[in-house]
Every structure is written in C-alpha cells, then in structure tokens.
C-alpha cells in the first residue's frame, strides 16, 4: 500500500525515483514522486 512504498523507497528530496515509482505501480497507483525524501504515490490506476 501507499505507506509501505514510503518505507521501502528512500529518495532524493524532490522528483521522480525509480524504486518509488515501481513500488507505487505494483500497489496499483499510476506512479510516484519524491517529496521531502519520502515516496508519495500518485492516483490509483484502473479504478
């Protein structure tokens, strides 16, 4: 889920990050972005 992606995907302060995006996609989101070193998932896909 969204929170597990935050825990697994440490990242730079801002911008896209591969692990973050991949984690979010597996969780059913369209992708993810890094905000203040945390992975934030985008809108859910296919719902």
From Swiss-Prot:
Q: Which domain of life is it from?
A: Eukaryota
Q: Where are the transmembrane segments?
A: none
Checking Pfam families in the record gives: Toxin_17
Disulfide bonds, paired cysteine numbers:
5-23, 11-34, 20-39, 24-41
Give the GO cellular component terms, alphabetically.
extracellular region
Entry's localization field: Secreted
Q: PROSITE patterns in the record, alphabetically?
A: ERGTX
One Gene Ontology molecular-function label:
potassium channel inhibitor activity
Instruction: Keywords in alphabetical order, please.
Output: Disulfide bond, Ion channel impairing toxin, Knottin, Neurotoxin, Potassium channel impairing toxin, Secreted, Toxin, Voltage-gated potassium channel impairing toxin
* Free-text note regarding domains: The presence of a 'disulfide through disulfide knot' structurally defines this protein as a knottin.
Q: Which family does it belong to?
A: Belongs to the ergtoxin family. Gamma-KTx 5 subfamily.
Sum up the protein's function in the record's words. Reversibly blocks Kv11/ERG potassium channels.
Question: Could you tell me what this protein is called?
Answer: Potassium channel toxin gamma-KTx 5.2
């Amino acid at each position: 889920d969204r929170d597990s992606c935050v825990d697994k995907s440490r990242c730079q302060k801002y911008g896209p990050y591969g692990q973050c995006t991949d984690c979010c996609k597996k969780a059913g989101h369209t992708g993810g972005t890094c905000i203040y070193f945390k992975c934030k998932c985008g809108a859910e896909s296919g719902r």
